[in-house]
Amino acid sequence: MKKSFLFTFTVLTIFTILVIGVAPEKLTTCSRFLSQKSGKCVKEDCDRMCKQKWPGKYTVGHCYGQFKDAKRCLCSVCGPDRQPP
């Protein structure tokens, strides 16, 4: 009886540890407008400024607005439970 309880407890413990370790990371998406001087948004500059303000491999900058008249820089940060400050 004691051995079967110990065996069951060990199997359940190992199973629980494996399930917790394999659980996928929760992803969140955060987008913030970056204050920018007046003028046209340039994608390369927008991307660079976003990565300076919110460093990380998930940070991307996009120009937001009418196609060629985009005037705002939108920073998107997508990562495991990460929010821009």
From Swiss-Prot:
Disulfide bonds: 30-78, 41-63, 46-73, 50-75
Subcellular location: Secreted
Signal peptide range: 1-24
Residue ranges of the TM segments: none
Record's keyword terms, sorted: Antimicrobial, Disulfide bond, Fungicide, Plant defense, Secreted, Signal
GO annotation, biological process: defense response to fungus; killing of cells of another organism
InterPro entries the record matches: DEFL
Matches recorded under Pfam families: SLR1-BP (PF07333)
Cellular component aspect of the GO annotation: extracellular region
Family: Belongs to the DEFL family.
Name this polypeptide is given: Putative defensin-like protein 142
Organism: Arabidopsis thaliana (Mouse-ear cress)
Lineage, opening ranks: Eukaryota, Viridiplantae, Streptophyta, Embryophyta, Tracheophyta
